[in-house]
Design a protein with these regions (language model features):
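Low-complexity, acidic Ser/Thr/Pro-rich "mucin-like" tracts of secreted and single-pass surface proteins
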Residues: 219-298
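Generic serine detector
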Residues: 13-16, 26, 47, 68, ...
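Short, low-hydrophobicity acidic/polar segments
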Residues: 1-129, 209, 274, 278-282
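Residue-level detector of intrinsically disordered, flexible termini
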Residues: 47, 57, 66-69, 135, ...
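Tryptophan-paired
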Residues: 1-46, 112, 119-232
Length: 298
């Protein structure tokens, strides 16, 4: 097998379209419905879970999960290391499967895949504040499905972790870079699996105000200061507009503070366009080369 892209085929009735579940940038292992048992991302692993006549596409999409992150996830932000690529997926309907079948849109254009993660970036534009970086990301899902059939976010409230660089929060997880008019983490974004608002996923950042370093809690809230979901294939940018006062002296105090820290005024912009850049475009579009068909038939 090529080890990068797989297409799983299931036999359909005579009048039905074939549903091609395309998984690109695939991991080398997966978990099925839990965080305990791993399976190889190959025909043997799939065959262990795909029960002929029993397993539906919905079942497979619901249970096909990434490998779980550790608790806590120390110094590890998924898919941010050198050479790591982000899993992506697409569900394509075709009316037949043979040597003439093309993996493309009906107009001949390449398929635009859906990323399995969300992206978060912090930008500081406040003149009275200096963003140092991200210290921790709290209440982060440990796993995510490789593809969602219904578009709903998986209930992972009991399967959470946190990103941090060390146990004492003594160093930054993500360091901000200087940009024109402020600082930004664009060059080192935070990736995470889609997260329900009930998880209360939030960031702890470090910044300088009035000549001193403080910690601030940044919740994922909308314009009405209501918690919101973090969805796959979406980019979230926090823009700090102004600092109203000091934050907290310790990370623990910041973690225990109210969900929306009133010491910072910030805006959250959400980009759900398929074209926002997470990885290079050549990893984002699926062509017909380097693809493997694994056919399951009766």
């Amino acid at each position: 097998l090529a080890g990068k892209r797989y297409v799983i085929l299931t036999k359909q009735s005579n009048d039905s379209e074939y549903q091609l579940l395309i998984l690109a940038n695939s991991p080398d292992r997966f978990y099925y419905g839990d965080a305990v048992t791993e399976y190889g991302f190959d025909e043997t692993g799939f065959s262990a879970q795909l029960m002929q006549g029993l397993t539906t596409l919905a079942d497979f999409c619901t249970n096909m999960l990434t490998a779980p992150l550790a608790v806590p996830s120390v110094s590890v932000i998924p898919y941010s290391g050198n050479g790591q690529v982000i899993p992506m997926s697409y569900l394509l309907e075709v009316d037949k499967i043979d040597h003439t079948t093309k993996i493309e849109n009906t107009d001949g254009t390449p398929l635009m895949l859906t990323r399995a993660i969300a992206k978060m970036v912090i930008v500081n534009k406040a003149t009275n504040f200096e963003l140092k970086g991200v210290v921790a990301v709290m209440n982060v899902p440990r796993q995510g499905p490789l593809h969602t059939l219904d578009g709903l976010i998986r209930d992972n409230t009991s399967n959470l972790t946190e990103y941090r660089n060390d146990a004492a929060y003594s160093s930054l997880l993500v360091q901000a870079d200087f940009i024109d008019g402020g600082e930004s983490t664009e060059n080192d974004p935070v990736y995470l699996y889609e997260s329900d608002m009930r998880n209360n996923t939030h960031l702890i950042i470090q910044g300088a105000y009035g000549g001193r370093d403080y910690f601030y809690k940044m919740a994922i809230v909308n314009k009405d200061v209501q918690l919101m979901d973090l969805q796959r294939n979406h980019s979230y940018q926090f823009t700090i507009v102004t600092a109203k006062g000091p934050g907290y002296d310790t990370v623990e105090d910041a973690k225990a503070s109210k969900p929306s820290n009133t010491a910072l005024d910030y805006e959250i912009s959400v980009d759900n366009r398929d074209s926002y850049e997470v990885v290079a475009n050549n990893d984002f579009f699926l062509g017909v080369s380097n693809s493997v068909f694994i056919a399951y038939t009766s």
